[in-house]
């Protein structure tokens, strides 16, 4: 696991091991406190925020005892305030689909690109190598170095300073869009398809693929390159309840789902008992849109008005045959500008829907809030499940509201084939301590470990959780993980 940078990493491991061996509990407390700032640390300690500190201490005591279950994942060096990036790198290392996506891109490029991959796809190459390293479970402590990824990322995200404290969710989005930029530039259509058949529009959409199987495969390959595993699609629909029409339906890709917690009155605290399901429901709930003009409702009202005032049959027919599109000229051509009308007749609702379940689902709990004077952080626990069923939050057809859907799904047994559709397993939790814009990030990672005997029999996997604060790694229990005040949650589709 340390072969690529053998001597360098080994040296770091030695230094860290020595430091931990000599450390008593105060040294480990103080090194942690140094990261947070003393004030934040005292606050966190008073409020019991360091459930893991005891584990960290225990861990340093357990150094010499390398028993049968003392396997570990590598930590990551902090190269100066980059804990926000380290947690993202650890999180991505836990996402099997993300690691295999990077490997697939490199593999795919091997056939079509001339020259060294390290030169052509420097960020993909560096990230893939680091994530493989972080994904390797070992029996000894090791610490990996994120420097190469940081250097290559800086070339793309020039305005994103990686050495001053940043938001972890923002770092993830920068990393994804930088990768996208690199991968798209290096994309070459496969030899079997004709380059002239493939046109790219400015917004990175492939237009008019060549016909037949090759064209379809090329399109799939292009989408896979472009979107990666964070490939969810969010639909946004506007409906008019008054005339039961759909005004608009738009789709967009999403990398993360930003969910706001439920708040107590006043909006300074997260409501006790708030769950991730509550937040999802709130996010996907219909909301009333004010001051929006429904053309179909207007046409209905205009038809009644013309009949009442005894207008000519030809005028009524013109209105009736109009599709009620927002571009029509009924208002002016029929002199209806003065018709008494208020848009409050229409009841317009907006709703977001998850139109495609992503392979990897990243949920961003929006804890940053504002009042009149300043930005503040919403702290408090939001319960989240180990297994999430996202299909419960997706209306089967537009207009069916989510509560009805939940009732429906519990009433009727789903067919066997679609049983796992929309089912997700928790793989990583990112937690933030301290104030927004400063403080410290830590991460919980789940790692699947196969013991040798099990591998021979039926490959039963053993899921272990680790708490990681930069270079410090320790094993924790599932309940430690579920107790976290999550900022980011990564779920993998089952
Ligand atoms: Zn309407
Ligand atoms: Zn019209």
Curated annotation (Swiss-Prot):
The keyword NADP does not apply. The keyword Hydrolase applies. Its main location: membrane. GO terms for cellular component: membrane. It catalyses: Thiol-dependent hydrolysis of ester, thioester, amide, peptide and isopeptide bonds formed by the C-terminal Gly of ubiquitin (a 76-residue protein attached to proteins as an intracellular targeting signal). Its EC number is 3.4.19.12. It is found in: Membrane. Keywords: Hydrolase, Membrane, Protease, Thiol protease, Transmembrane, Transmembrane helix, Ubl conjugation pathway. PANTHER family: UBIQUITIN CARBOXYL-TERMINAL HYDROLASE, UBIQUITIN CARBOXYL-TERMINAL HYDROLASE 30. This is Ubiquitin carboxyl-terminal hydrolase 27. It comes from Arabidopsis thaliana. The lineage of its organism: Eukaryota, Viridiplantae, Streptophyta, Embryophyta, Tracheophyta.
